[in-house]
């Protein structure tokens, strides 16, 4: 087996926006910030979020006070 061909592994900290910290080993040498993790993602928590942000057309109608059909 050849030596020094495998990347180095570093222990890094992954920080979620919910405050959860996860320590993992990675070939990256810096810490990572993520938006969602298994602690706060709806698939893992079983809680369903409703998204009340409309599409582009709804935003346009709302901005210019146009009634939709």
Swiss-Prot record:
**Which is an annotated Pfam family here?**
Ribosomal_L31
Matching entries from SUPFAM superfamilies are given as:
L28p-like
Query: Which keywords appear in this protein's UniProt record, sorted alphabetically?
Result: Metal-binding, Ribonucleoprotein, Ribosomal protein, RNA-binding, rRNA-binding, Zinc
Q: Which organism is it from?
A: Buchnera aphidicola subsp. Baizongia pistaciae (strain Bp)
Gene encoding this chain?
rpmE
The entry describes its oligomerization and partners as: Part of the 50S ribosomal subunit.
Q: How is the cofactor bound?
A: Binds 1 zinc ion per subunit.
UniProt-listed InterPro entries = Ribosomal_bL28/bL31-like_sf, Ribosomal_bL31, Ribosomal_bL31_A, Ribosomal_bL31_sf
Q: Which HAMAP family match?
A: Ribosomal_bL31_1
Q: Family assignment?
A: Belongs to the bacterial ribosomal protein bL31 family. Type A subfamily.
In Gene Ontology terms, what is one molecular function of this protein? rRNA binding
Positions the record marks as coiled coil are none
Q: Which PANTHER family match?
A: 50S RIBOSOMAL PROTEIN L31, CHLOROPLASTIC (PTHR33280), LARGE RIBOSOMAL SUBUNIT PROTEIN BL31A (PTHR33280:SF6)
A GO CC term? ribosome
The source's superkingdom equals Bacteria
Reported function: Binds the 23S rRNA.
What is a biological process (GO) this protein takes part in? translation
The record's section on NCBIfam families has:
L31, PRK00019.1, PRK00528.1
Tell me the protein's name. Large ribosomal subunit protein bL31
Residues the record lists as binding Zn(2+): 16, 18, 37, 40
Identify the cofactor(s). Answer: Zn(2+)
């Amino acid at each position: 087996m050849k030596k020094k061909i495998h990347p180095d592994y570093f222990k890094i900290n992954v920080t979620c926006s919910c405050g959860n910290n996860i320590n993992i080993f990675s070939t990256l040498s810096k810490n990572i910030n993520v938006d969602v993790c298994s602690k706060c993602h709806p698939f893992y928590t079983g809680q369903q979020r409703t998204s009340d942000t409309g599409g582009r057309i709804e935003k346009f109608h709302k901005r210019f006070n146009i009634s939709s059909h």
